[in-house]
Amino acid sequence: MTIEEIINKIETHMWEGILIHNAMAETYDFLGLRGYARFHHYQMYEEMCSMMHLSHYYFTHYHKLIKKDEFMPQPIIPDSWYKYTSMDVDASTKRNAIKDLTERWINWERETKTLY
């Protein structure tokens, strides 16, 4: 792989991370789990800062812009949730959501570790 392909792949993964953390923060806000939401907001901002540093590094060292690949991450929020309000959420839904979201996040972080 060329340096351009490597940087592009990493940046694409970072964009996906930003979207994942944003969706998780929204989901946890919906579930009334503010601490989890704040954590994922923070992770989203950290991911964004890292991506900006990567872009800056690539531009200052290689004097090129990073070509943006098209990607579509898997949705975090289940489609069925859009017909409910946060008042409809019960303890069982929160428990299952925390378990599912944490598993997805851990898997994504494992993919990130493998990629880097």
Describe the function of each predicted region:
Residues M1-E5:
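Membrane-interacting alpha-helical segments
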Residues R34-W81:
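Conserved alpha-helical segments that form or flank metal/cofactor-binding pockets of metalloenzymes
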Residues E26-Y36:
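Inter-helical turn/loop segments and adjacent helix faces that build the functional surface
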Residues I6-H13, G17, H21-M24, I76-Y116:
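Acidic/histidine-rich alpha-helical segments that form the ligand environment
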Residues L19, L31-L33, M52-L54, L65, ...:
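Generic detector of leucine side chains in alpha-helical contexts
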